[in-house]
Amino acid sequence: WDLGLVVGHATRTIDEAVRLSRDDLTIRTSLLDSRWLWGDQRVFENFKKRFQEAFDRSTALEFVEAKLAERDARHKYMGDTRYVLEPNIKEGKGGLRDLQTLFWIAKYLYCVDDLRDLLELGVLTDKDVRLFTRAENFFWGVRCHLHYNSNRAEERLTFNVQSEISRCLNYADRSGAQGVERFMKHYFLITKD
């Protein structure tokens, strides 16, 4: 807080967390990403166990359909194309939120916490994991530079920041293509995969 960071947080008992998650997809999704930071790790493990028991495979279809409907509504709102001149790296089609949605669905279906667990289960291939990880790292890198250069939580790659971010990420001019063109081409290739 002292640094000006916005931190999403809540304090709940295990029973409250599970109960609220039944009716609120946002809470349920955020609890999928919960992780132990400090305190009694046994309490956290108990929470994870209770959460997974409450939201087992019998609730999976409902969760997947809701997340896909959420994604479709977001895509429609953002123009339903990944090829916009000033893309939204978080909410745009093929962007960070789409990667997160895929992983949330996989976490829900397979009760995993790590992408590599999906490789071990045979759900993903080595190539899938590499593509996903490369895309995720790219988006987070771009997003961090975007927030830093904008001095705020900005998600759109506007024209006035595309050149600066391309320089920060070492996209140099080459014969036939400026660095910013190479950067945006890479962005669109990542969103396509």
Report the location of each language-model feature.
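A nucleotide- and high-energy phosphate-metabolite-utilizing enzyme signature
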Residues: 1-193
